[in-house]
Amino acid sequence: MEKIKDSRFELVDQAKLNSEVVVRPNISYWKDAWRRLRKNPVAMTALFVLVAIILMSVFAPILRNMDYETVVTAKKNLPPNSEFWFGSDGMGRDLFTRVWIGARVSISIAIVATLIDVVVGCLYGGIAAYCGGIVDEIMMRIVEVLNSIPSLILTLLILVVLGNGYYQLMLALCITAWTGCARMIRGQILQLRESEYVLAAEALGASPIRIITKHLLPNTIGLIILEVASTIPSVIVYETTLSFLGLGLSIPAFSLGSLLSAGQQAMAFYPYQLLFPTIVLCLIILSFNIFGDGLRDALDPKLRQ
C-alpha cells in the first residue's frame, strides 16, 4: 500500500478557513418571491397595465369631468373626436367616461366577490380539515351537492328572485364560487394539521378557531394569493356575461358587460361603441391572467432552490 506523503497536506488556520466560506444572505419567503416576480418581465408588464387600468378607472372620469348620464340627442353616435375621445353612444353620452366607470364597476364587483369567496372558502375548508371525521364528511358532501348544481342556473334563480343590483349580483357570484377554494384549503390543511407547531398550540390549550386562523391559514397564504389572482378574472368574465345578456346590473347602473351589449346592437354602423369596451375588457382579463401565472411561478415552493 502506497504511503501518503506529508507534502500532500496543508495546514490551514481558522482565518483562512473562514475566508473561503461562501455566505449566502438569508432571504425570507416573500423577498425571494418578490425577487422572482421582478425577474419576470411579462408578469411585471401585466402588473403595470393592471395598475394603469385601475388608476384610469378611478381618476379618468374625475379628470375628464364629462356628464355620462344626461341624454343629449344632438350629440348621439358621434365618432371619436376632441370632445368625445371614445365617441358618444346612442344617447349622446361620453363613451370614454362610461367605459372607465364600467371598468371600475366590473373590477370592484369582482374583487369584493372574490374576497368573500376566499374568506368563506378558507374558513369552511379549514374547519372541515381540522375537525376531520364525520364533520369533514358532512361538510364535503355539502360542497359536492353545491357543485352538482349548475352555477349559471343558481345565479339566474337568485337574480330573478332578488332582482338586479350590486349586492344581488355579488351574492349570485359568490353562492357557489367558494367551493373550489374550500377544497384547496382543506387539502393543504390536511397536510399541516399534524405539524409540531399545531400540536404545541393544542397542548397550550388554544381553541380550534384560533389554531385555524392563527397557525394553519397563515401557512397557506401563498395558495390564497394565487386563488385570488386566478378567481378575479373569472368573476369579471362571469359578471360581464350576465350583464351582456341583460341579467346583471339594472339601468341606470352599468358595467363593461352592459356597454358591450349596447355596442353590439350598434356594431354595424358605429363599431367604435363596441371596440373600446372590448379592448379594455380584454386588457383587464389578459393582464390578470398573465400576472397570476407570474405569481404562481414566484410563489410555488417547488421552484425554490
Question: What would you call each of these model-derived segments?
Answer:
Residues 85, 89, 95, 116-191, ...:
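Generic hydrophobic transmembrane alpha-helix motif, especially the helices
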Residues 159-161, 173, 188-189, 230, ...:
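Glycine-rich helix-loop "coupling/hinge" segments at transmembrane-helix boundaries
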Residues 56, 178, 182, 231, ...:
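Alpha-helical transmembrane segments
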Residues 60-68, 129-133, 158-164, 176, ...:
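Short helix-capping/hinge motifs at transmembrane helix termini and TM-loop junctions
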Residues 1-122, 126, 133-134, 148, ...:
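Gly/Trp-centered helix-boundary motif
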Residues 53, 126, 156-160, 169, ...:
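Transmembrane alpha-helix boundary and packing residues in multipass membrane permease domains
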Residues 15-16, 105-109, 124, 136-140, ...:
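Short alpha-helical transmembrane interface motifs in multi-pass membrane proteins
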Residues 93-108, 112, 132-140, 190, ...:
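Amphipathic cytosolic juxtamembrane alpha-helices at the membrane-cytosol interface
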